[in-house]
Regions:
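Ser/Thr-rich, Proline-interspersed low-complexity disordered segments
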Residues: 3-77, 464
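C-terminal beta-strand-rich structural cap/linker in extracellular carbohydrate-active enzymes
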Residues: 479-497
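Loop/turn elements at helix/coil->beta-strand transitions in domains of secreted/extracellular proteins
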Residues: 80-84, 102-106, 140-146, 191-196, ...
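N-terminal substrate-binding region of glycoside hydrolase catalytic domains
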Residues: 68-199, 204-229, 259-261, 271
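Aromatic/acidic polysaccharide-binding cleft in carbohydrate-active enzymes
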Residues: 349-422, 426-435
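Noncatalytic carbohydrate-binding groove/subsite architecture in carbohydrate-active enzymes
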Residues: 229-373, 384
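Carbohydrate-binding surface patches
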Residues: 433-467, 474-476
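Conserved, mostly hydrophobic/aromatic
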Residues: 107, 139, 183, 197, ...
Length: 497
């Protein structure tokens, strides 16, 4: 969830409660923490939560972890249901059912708060996570793959006393890694089966930006005095936590907390400081590239007042030129990774959506735009090689929700249609044969589907040279054949075998 304004054109209207902790002296260097923890910490418990008193049901088999390809391998990543995901607020009791019925494969929760589990040094209160545990069980039973954010330092562990969202004190790091190790041991197995761990949320935010938000759901590791905005310190933390998480579960996936990437640091903006977006570079310059599996980032567009029109001025991104801002951010991340020769990392956009930012009333044009944005953002994510694209959120922020007061929106319907039409298909290529029309081709076996729309909204002539089996629009409405014109409404065009 983004917490900053953006520049836009004028159009934008263990089983025990006691944690066994290594006895490290105050001031011990972080770099010594991994060795010390490995030598002094208790063995990983072989059991997890206390067994329920009710009769036992058969233990479900662990859910397979999707094989995620590096982000550059567009064309080999299976899309459709395998990359769709939705974030759900922990208070949303019926959220799991709605995510499943939307056809999503991922569910994201924010999150597990260290301060709630260990408010006092060494004293664990896992019972504080009862609601989260219920949601994790529901997700596993529904066959959803969970991305779980871990955040929130207790007061005794904070570098900045007033900021739970900020960095951890060096002398508390040993306690943190043992907490993470025990957390993974507890929740990586049935009945929870969590495999994806996101370390903080939006760490590239300065503490000053969220100073008035108690227990901020954002991260705030950002250091304005540092050339790389504190990324090096976050990278140092990854070096410590990564081996301990892997020791608890070798299949665990450690994801850099969803980078906000507020604006493009390569483009000077007189009214905007883009130093925060150098956070990732700071991680890599400090040698953090070997201590994570994937990168999570966030990419929101802003409604520009007319159906199908949106953009993000901070990245010079607009609907009819660059498409969704996730494309610009994905390419930026790939560029930074390449500059530092870091390979084999997958990318997940863990917060996507189009916002009616600070709208007093929500026009119907926005709801139409949000619905159209679903196939556009997912097709673009596939073309850019993302391994996941998580809608924020089920209930929404700045009107981005797929539900509105527990009622489905047009965007929810569009989400279901995408899942049905592109289920388990592979992205093949972008077809550039028709001027002014975006066409992305997907394939499974001998089934071929084009996702297509007029890029600038103009009514464009189109002559499909191959036989067409059927056409439906973004909301699943059948369209007559033959197709001769196309507008801003995204279409699913299934070709004859």
């Amino acid at each position: 969830m983004a917490c900053q304004a953006q520049t836009t054109p004028s159009l934008q209207p263990t089983v025990t409660n006691e944690a066994v902790v290594p006895k490290l002296p105050i001031g011990t260097a972080i770099s010594a923490a991994v060795t010390s923890v490995a030598q002094n910490a208790a063995p990983i418990p072989t059991t997890t939560a206390p067994a329920p008193t009710a009769a036992k049901s058969p233990t479900p088999a662990p859910m397979p972890v999707p094989t995620l390809k590096p982000a550059a391998n567009a064309g080999t990543i299976v899309v459709g249901n395998n990359t769709t995901g939705i974030e759900v607020e922990l208070a949303a009791g019926a959220g799991t059912k709605a995510v499943k019925e939307a056809g999503a494969a991922w569910i994201r929760y924010n999150g597990l708060v260290w301060a709630d589990v260990e408010p006092n040094r060494g004293d664990r209160k896992w019972e504080s996570q009862a609601n989260l545990e219920t949601r994790l069980k529901e997700a596993a039973e529904a066959g959803l793959q969970t991305i779980l954010i871990v955040r929130g330092a207790p007061k005794w562990a904070r570098q900045l006393e007033s900021a739970s969202c900020g960095p951890i004190k060096p002398d508390a790091m040993a306690y943190y890694v043992v907490f993470l190790r025990d957390m993974v041991a507890r929740y990586s197995v049935a009945p929870y089966n969590v495999k994806y761990w996101e370390i903080w949320n939006e760490p590239d935010v300065a503490s000053e930006a969220v100073a008035n938000i108690p227990d901020s759901p954002f991260g705030c590791w950002g250091n304005p005095k540092d050339e790389y905005f504190g990324g090096g310190a976050y990278g140092e933390t990854l070096k410590v936590v990564y081996p301990l998480i892997k020791s608890a579960d070798p299949k665990a996936q450690v994801i850099i907390g969803g980078l906000l990437l507020d604006c493009d640091p390569r483009v000077a903006k007189p009214d905007k400081d883009c130093k925060p977006s150098k956070f990732l570079e700071g991680i890599l310059k400090n040698g953090g590239g070997s201590f994570f599996d994937g990168i999570s980032f966030h990419a929101y567009d802003f409604f520009y007042g007319k159906s199908g029109q949106y953009g993000n001025g901070n990245w010079d991104s607009v609907w009819n030129v660059t498409g969704p801002v996730l494309a610009a951010k994905t390419r930026f991340i790939k560029e930074v990774l390449a500059q530092h020769n870091v390979k084999g990392k997958y990318l997940i956009n863990t917060e996507t959506g189009v916002l009616c930012y600070q709208c007093q009333t929500v026009p119907v044009e926005f709801e139409i735009t949000k619905a159209y944005y679903v196939p556009v953002t997912y097709a673009t994510a596939a073309a850019e090689g993302l391994s996941g694209n998580i809608w924020y959120s089920l209930s929404g922020w700045q009107e981005s929700g797929l539900l509105n007061k527990n009622q489905t929106t047009l965007a929810y319907k569009a989400y279901q249609v995408w899942s049905q039409q592109i289920k388990d298909m592979q992205f093949v290529a972008e077809n550039t044969a028709v001027l002014g029309v975006k066409i992305y081709e997907f394939k499974r076996g001998d089934k071929r589907v084009w996702v297509a729309w007029s890029n600038d909204g103009s009514l464009r002539p189109i002559n499909v040279a191959v036989p067409v089996k059927s056409i439906v629009d973004a909301l699943g409405n059948p369209k007559p054949l033959p197709l001769t014109q196309i507008d801003i409404t995204p279409l699913y065009i299934e070709l004859e075998k």
